[in-house]
Amino acid sequence: SKTKAKRAPDPNPSGAEAWVPTLKERPKDKPFFLWLAAVDPHRDYAENVIPVPHRPEDVTVPPYLPDNAETRKDLALYYDEVSRLDDNVGKVMDEIAAQGVAENTVVMFISDNGRPFPRCKTTVYDSGIKSPFFIRWPAKVQANSTSQSLQSSVDIAPTILEIAGVEI
């Protein structure tokens, strides 16, 4: 009898391994909602998670962090994981396009906090609370537009329900 070889688990999972397979398996005749969360870019960081890693000597060190070899290495590894996350989001966007639903799909990309460095995550400094919040909705949001309005994650669920036509 044939047996499938088991793959060793990824020693440095991104948390995005199931994103595209999940999207491929969705019922194509129904609307869909996916909340995709990643491990990237959370600690502990791993080396070599992208083909061309960021070089510590090339990173920009924020003025509130010490500019030393340890900080530079930590920032480079953080940027590597952000890059891997970006690549995985790109794969999802490619799959949405391949399925022919890109023009009728609302995509939100958010982060719950700033990067996990001193004076960032868990603080009320801008570096802790100014986090990405992108929306792609071709029917309603002009590409490359920006907003200076205050946004909060508490608005996400009601907004999604309203978009879906659910009375709240």
Located regions from the model:
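Active-site-proximal cap/lid insertion segments
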Residues: S1-D10, T22-I168
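Extracytoplasmic mature domains of secreted/periplasmic and thylakoid-lumen proteins
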Residues: G15-W19
